Swiss-Prot record:
Full protein name: Probable anion transporter 7
Tree of life domain: Eukaryota
Any one GO molecular function term: phosphate transmembrane transporter activity
InterPro entries in the record: MFS, MFS_dom, MFS_Na/Anion_cotransporter, MFS_trans_sf, SLC17A9-like
């Protein structure tokens, strides 16, 4: 990293790499808890509804801090917000014992980890909006967010064996160490964005006057930018982003939190016996997320399609293909078929992020963190609804004497996000735009 900074390696690339590692570690933590808690809870016979409640507590905390996260990043800087958030959740992971019988402690710890991590993604998008020029945004955001999926893949591959040999508590220790390590690296190598690192662009007259004044020795007073809350809340393009963010995270969180249970109970297959195949759905997300970013930037920079058409095209392809794969998933009763369907579904969902997930930087580059906070609030609500509802669906099936190994039991679980994907793609096609609507 030091060698890179000494060379003529643009600092913004270092920032993008660090935010990629940041999202990687965050999702290692989320997948790690789901695996460790599932093993510990199943060992003592915790019912599916209670499991769903504990797994969803993270999202209750997460939803509380999305908009405050965007506001904080706007006011004190995304760099500081990221550092404080990481240190907080890392300390909680390192100090809290994993005991399914101590539900109050688990509820509070997951709530506070959710609050801490809720500041992270609005802060990341504030940082990227400051550092990354428009022609690099699709691939930069896609690379950063692909860290989530690589982290999930790594967690699915590594943690089942760790739990088997070292116990469920060891997962928390590993997560805490990774969190602290990233915090130290971020503190050392990140910085506030200087104007000189970005490619030269024409600056507004106001900025030019400020620059002249600063060069003359004058002090330029920082301007407080008024956030157009009303226009944001009532903007149809923003709502198109919000709806798609909700659907993306509903599908992702249901699969992330309940796919281990589907393998264990639906297919009667131990995660430890699946080898590397269990990481393929998330690794596929990593690959397709970056493909989507590169394709989007190519279409835009070569002027093959407008920004608006590019976002709509990739979003539609991603969500529609994902919907088909989701609804086909419970029809496959073999491990290979399930891995194939979940890989296609999650991979194309990640491809669709080159549509809706970058769009807030198109429509509101100055308020990217705020719009991200608003849309990610919807995404977090999807986690609360989806994860909790799935637990209730499965518990209701058991109460009706339905076997969890029966594919009919799981159809509702996977059909709901499938239909949501189709609905959301239509909304984005109709209402989204790639034009700047907030100055």
């Amino acid at each position: 990293m030091t060698a890179l900074t000494r060379m003529k390696f643009p600092k913004r690339y270092v920032i993008v790499l660090l935010t990629f590692i940041c999202t990687n570690v965050c999702y290692i933590e989320r997948v790690g808890f789901s695996i460790a808690y599932t093993v510990a809870a199943d060992a003592i016979g915790v019912n599916q509804a209670n499991k769903g409640m504990i797994l969803s507590m993270f999202y209750y905390g997460y939803v509380l801090s999305q908009i405050p996260g965007g506001w904080a990043a706007q006011r004190i800087g995304g760099r500081r917000v990221l550092l404080l958030s990481f240190v907080l959740w890392s300390l909680i992971c390192g100090l809290i014992p994993l005991d399914p019988k101590r539900e109050v402690i688990l509820v509070l710890s997951r709530l506070f980890v959710g609050v801490a991590q809720g500041f992270i993604f609005p802060a990341i998008h504030t940082v990227l909006a400051q550092w990354v020029p428009p022609q690099e945004r699709s691939r930069s955001v896609s690379l950063t967010t692909s860290g989530m999926y690589l982290g999930a893949a790594g967690g699915m591959l590594f943690f089942p064996s760790l739990v088997k040999h070292m116990g469920a508590q060891s997962v928390f220790f590993v997560e805490a160490v990774l969190g602290v390590a990233w915090s130290v690296i971020w503190l050392k190598f990140s910085s506030e964005p200087p104007r000189t690192d970005l490619p030269k662009v024409s600056m507004p007259k106001v900025a030019s006057r400020e620059k002249i004044k600063a060069q003359a020795g004058g002090v330029v007073a920082p301007r407080t930018v008024k956030i157009p809350w009303r226009r944001i809340i009532f903007s149809l393009p923003v709502w198109a982003i919000v709806v798609n963010n909700f659907t993306f995270h509903y599908a992702l969180y249901v699969l992330m939190n309940w796919l281990p249970t589907y393998f264990e109970l639906g297919l009667q297959l131990s995660l430890q016996d699946m080898g590397s195949s269990k990481m393929l759905p998330y690794f596929n997300m990593f690959i397709f997320s970056n493909i989507g970013g590169v394709v989007a930037d190519h279409l835009i920079t070569r002027r093959i399609l407008s920004i608006t058409k590019t976002r709509k095209l990739l979003n539609t392809i991603g969500f529609v293909v994902s919907a088909v794969a989701l609804m086909a998933l419970p029809l496959f009763r073999t491990p290979s078929g399930t891995v194939l369907c979940s890989s296609i579904s999650l991979g194309f969902l990640a491809l669709g992020r080159a549509g809706f997930a970058v769009n807030h930087m198109d429509v509101a580059p100055k308020f990217a963190g705020i719009v991200m906070g608003v849309s990610n609030t919807a995404g977090t609500l999807a986690g609360i609804v989806g994860v909790g509802l799935t637990g209730s669906i499965l518990e209701g099936a058991k109460a009706s004497n339905m076997d969890l190994t029966n594919s009919e039991t799981w159809k509702t679980v996977f059909f709901v996000p499938g239909y949501l994907c189709i609905f959301s793609s239509i909304i984005f096609l109709i209402f989204s735009t790639g034009e700047k609507i907030f100055e």
